C-alpha cells in the first residue's frame, strides 16, 4: 500500500513537469525556469504549484488574475498518478516500479504525438537508454533480448514505411514511429514486441474507423498518431505478457 501511495505522489510530480513540457516545447518556449500564469504572466509561487491540489483549491483559476488555468495540467497530473497506482497495484515490487517508469517515460511521447504528430528524437533516445540499462527485471528479459527487440521493432516499422512509399508514392508513417518502437523494444524485448504491435495496430484501426466521418478523406489518406497507440499498447502489453507467459 505504501508503494502505491508513493507511486501516486511521484506520478503527480512527474505529470506536472510533463504537462509543462508538452505545452511549452512545441511552441519553442523553455521548459526550464519559474512557472508563470499564461494570462497575466505573474510568477507562480510554491503554493500555486502543488500538483492537482493547487488547481482544486483555486477552482482551476490563477490566484493573481482569476483567469482559468488550462485543465490539461490537472488531467496529465492525474493520469500520471493513476499510472503509478495501476502499475504498483497490479505488479508489486521492482517489476511494478519499472513498469510505472516505462509508462511515465512514454507519457510525453504519447501526448506530443496526439497533439502535434511529433515524436522527439531526444525523448526516444532517453526511453531507449533507460530501457537498455534498467528494464531487465520488468519482464525478465536479458540485455540481448532487449537489443534484438530494439533492432527488430525499428527495422520492421522502417521497412513498413519504406514499402508504403514505394507502393503509394507518399509517406505512410512518421519518421519518429520506427524510433519509438525501437525504444519500446529496449524495454519489452523481442518476445513481447509482436503483442505490442498487434495491440497498437488494432487500436489505431479502431480509432480511425470510429472517427471516420462522412466526407472525410479515405482511411488510407488519413494521418493517424500511431505513436500514441504504440504507447498505449506498450502499457497494456506488460501485464498481458506477464499473464500469458505465466510470470
Give the ranges of each region predicted by the language model:
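Functional transmembrane core segments of multi-pass inner-membrane proteins
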Residues: 7, 97, 101-207, 246-247
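Hydrophobic alpha-helical transmembrane segments and immediately flanking/interface helices
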Residues: 72-80, 96-100, 213-226
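Alpha-helical transmembrane segments of multipass membrane proteins
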Residues: 14-19, 80, 84, 134, ...
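Juxtamembrane boundary at the C-terminal end of a transmembrane helix
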Residues: 239-247
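Long, highly hydrophobic alpha-helical transmembrane signal-anchor segments
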Residues: 1-26, 121
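Transmembrane helix-loop-helix
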Residues: 86-98
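Membrane-proximal soluble regions of multi-pass membrane proteins
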Residues: 18-75, 226
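Interfacial loop-to-transmembrane junctions
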Residues: 174-176, 209-236
Amino acid at each position: 500500500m505504501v508503494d502505491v501511495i508513493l507511486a501516486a505522489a511521484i506520478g503527480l510530480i512527474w505529470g506536472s513537469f510533463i504537462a509543462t513540457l508538452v505545452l511549452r516545447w512545441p511552441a519553442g518556449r523553455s521548459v526550464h525556469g519559474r512557472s508563470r500564469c499564461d494570462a497575466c504572466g505573474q510568477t507562480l509561487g510554491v503554493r500555486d504549484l502543488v500538483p492537482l491540489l493547487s488547481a482544486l483549491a483555486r477552482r482551476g483559476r490563477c490566484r493573481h488574475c482569476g483567469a482559468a488555468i488550462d485543465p490539461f495540467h490537472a488531467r496529465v497530473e492525474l493520469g500520471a498518478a493513476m499510472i503509478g497506482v495501476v502499475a504498483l497495484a497490479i505488479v508489486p515490487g521492482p517489476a511494478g516500479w519499472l513498469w510505472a517508469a516505462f509508462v511515465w517515460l512514454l507519457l510525453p511521447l504519447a501526448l506530443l504525438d496526439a497533439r502535434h504528430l511529433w515524436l522527439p528524437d531526444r525523448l526516444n533516445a532517453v526511453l531507449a537508454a533507460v530501457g537498455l540499462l534498467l528494464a531487465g527485471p520488468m519482464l525478465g528479459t536479458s540485455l540481448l533480448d532487449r537489443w534484438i527487440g530494439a533492432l527488430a521493432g525499428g527495422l520492421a516499422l522502417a521497412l513498413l514505411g519504406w514499402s508504403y512509399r514505394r507502393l503509394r508514392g507518399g509517406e505512410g508513417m512518421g519518421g519518429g514511429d520506427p524510433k519509438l518502437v525501437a525504444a519500446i523494444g529496449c524495454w519489452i524485448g523481442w518476445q513481447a514486441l509482436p503483442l505490442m504491435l498487434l495491440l497498437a495496430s488494432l487500436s489505431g484501426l479502431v480509432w480511425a474507423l470510429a472517427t471516420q466521418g462522412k466526407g472525410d478523406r479515405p482511411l488510407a489518406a488519413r494521418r493517424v498518431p500511431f505513436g500514441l497507440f504504440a504507447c498505449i499498447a506498450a502499457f497494456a502489453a506488460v501485464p498481458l505478457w506477464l499473464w500469458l507467459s505465466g510470470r
